[in-house]
């Protein structure tokens, strides 16, 4: 994989990449992204992609909303599901006002936790991942009439069954 910004540009050209998709998650785990056409991506932008942090719920006030996405060049891959060849790059969020990684960025939080784990000696490894929560319904009845709408859910896992 490419290790420098110059290598990334060359890799993209060799693979006929049309778009770069810079991705990050908010504190709630929701994916966000900023996309650029390949013609507008330079080595400089791969050092920091500007974006408006006030557009992310509970992140930044409008008067201090300028933030940077710092691409993690070890994470890039060509997205197999896009119609046009797209290079995906996961990013760390950087607070330009405090000149440090953003404290609400899940990647920054995980890196701090790993650093603490190593420095304190309380553990050798940490594993992070999403927690998938869902319910399985055994039956669903829907009523949708001009004068009434309702639904009824039944599940062997429901509290009304215990």
What are these regions (language model features)?
Residues 1-162:
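Glycine-rich, acidic/polar active-site loops that bind/position phosphate-bearing ligands
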């Amino acid at each position: 994989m490419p290790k420098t910004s110059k290598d990334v540009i060359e890799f993209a050209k060799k693979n006929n990449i049309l778009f770069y998709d810079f991705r990050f998650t908010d504190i709630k785990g929701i994916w966000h992204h900023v996309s650029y056409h390949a013609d507008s991506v330079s080595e400089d932008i791969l050092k920091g992609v500007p974006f408006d942090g006030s557009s992310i719920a509970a992140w930044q006030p409008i008067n201090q909303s300028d933030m940077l996405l710092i691409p993690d060049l070890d994470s890039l891959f060509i997205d197999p599901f896009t119609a046009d060849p797209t290079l995906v790059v996961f990013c760390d969020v950087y607070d330009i006002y405090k000149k440090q990684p953003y404290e609400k960025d899940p990647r920054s939080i995980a890196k701090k936790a790993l650093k603490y784990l190593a420095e304190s000696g309380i553990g050798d490894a940490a594993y992070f991942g999403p927690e998938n929560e869902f319910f399985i319904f055994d039956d669903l009845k829907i009523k949708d009439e001009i004068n009434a709408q309702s639904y009824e859910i039944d599940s062997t896992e429901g509290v009304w069954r215990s």
